[in-house]
Amino acid sequence: MWIKELELKHYRNYDHLLASFSSGLNVFIGNNAQGKTNFLEAIYFLSLTRSHRTRADKELIHFDHSTVSLTGKIQRISGTVDLEINLSDKGRVTKINALKQAKLSDYIGTMMVVLFAPEDLQLVKGAPSLRRKFIDIDLGQIKPVYLSELSHYNHVLKQRNSYLKSAQQIDAAFLAVLDEQLASYGARVMEHRIDFINALEKEANTHHQAISNGLESLSLSYQSSVVFDKKTNIYQQFLHQLEKNHQKDFFRKNTSVGPHRDELAFYINGMNANFASQGQHRSLILSLKMAEVSLMKALTGDNPILLLDDVMSELDNTRQTKLLETVIKENVQTFITTTSLDHLSQLPEGIRIFHVTKGTVQIDSDIH
């Protein structure tokens, strides 16, 4: 899939923008604070209905307006799709082909994106919540049902934690109802995550071995707070541990086990990647991003759109070459932001170059 056209109205520092793109590489050049990252954020927002930079929707609205409108014309294998998001102080409205979507799970996945931004370099050593978010964003695009089940899980988790904080004593019968619901939704969330990590590991290891010239292998480990011996009995084991932890959870006023506490670990040649070098971290993250692209195509039959936000300067020539080779081989529409073409040592033919200045975007040229 690829974005043929994007229109922004009152988004960040863009009062109004209408642009069309190449189905291959699109490079956006400009000084800092001109709107390059805002532009990629808009594509991300149109795909996932959320920003990767802020939770405050009001920050997305142009300073002298009260509403935001984003529309995009997306070419999928199945045909052209029009996406639209309207944002105001009353909330957000999402539409596919002018039809309002009642649930996010009906909208997300229509246009898949993979974002590679400087903050992704913190994925290995950052907080566990970053790694859970990484899993959730990918899975939500590949399997819309996952978003629905995760939403149900989080709703019941909030109910259970609220009860634990307010109750003077445990009502075993009431807690049993919440336990059953939490274990049911949570088990399905974990099953999806386990399948995803197993598939992602194979793709990521293939890319990592290519980047390291066969010197390194990459493995991923989904580490659950729920102890289970096989995937088919997660529900029973989860339910048992919730019941077992009633007193502990009541004392601590929160739920001590479940996918909301699960972790993802990375290993290079069998050693925890927390102890890897900076160069190895960059190779690991690059391998993951390329694996995301490959896996989304394998599981859905369509390519995602790749967003590279000021990361090419973080990669040496070898890693740049590997990334661009993958993009070209997989025929992935790619958006690259940069302050200079000097960092892009291996630009192929057929790219489209744009210049970004103070919230305006002007096409420079197509390189053939």
From Swiss-Prot:
For this UniProt entry, what's an example GO CC term?
cytoplasm
Q: Where in the cell is it found?
A: Cytoplasm
GO terms, molecular function:
ATP binding; single-stranded DNA binding
Q: Which InterPro entries match?
A: DNA-binding_RecF (IPR001238), DNA-binding_RecF_CS (IPR018078), P-loop_NTPase (IPR027417), RecF/RecN/SMC_N (IPR003395), RecF_2 (IPR042174)
Query: Superkingdom of the source?
Result: Bacteria
Q: Principal localization?
A: cytoplasm
Listed CDD domains: ABC_RecF
Residues annotated as binding ATP are: 30-37
**BP terms from Gene Ontology:** DNA replication; DNA synthesis involved in DNA repair; double-strand break repair; SOS response
Alphabetically list the UniProt keywords.
Answer: ATP-binding, Cytoplasm, DNA damage, DNA repair, DNA replication, DNA-binding, Nucleotide-binding, SOS response
Report the sequence similarity comment from the record: Belongs to the RecF family.
Q: What does this protein do?
A: The RecF protein is involved in DNA metabolism; it is required for DNA replication and normal SOS inducibility. RecF binds preferentially to single-stranded, linear DNA. It also seems to bind ATP.
What's the protein name?
DNA replication and repair protein RecF
Tell me which species this is from. Answer: Streptococcus pyogenes serotype M1
Q: Which gene encodes it?
A: recF
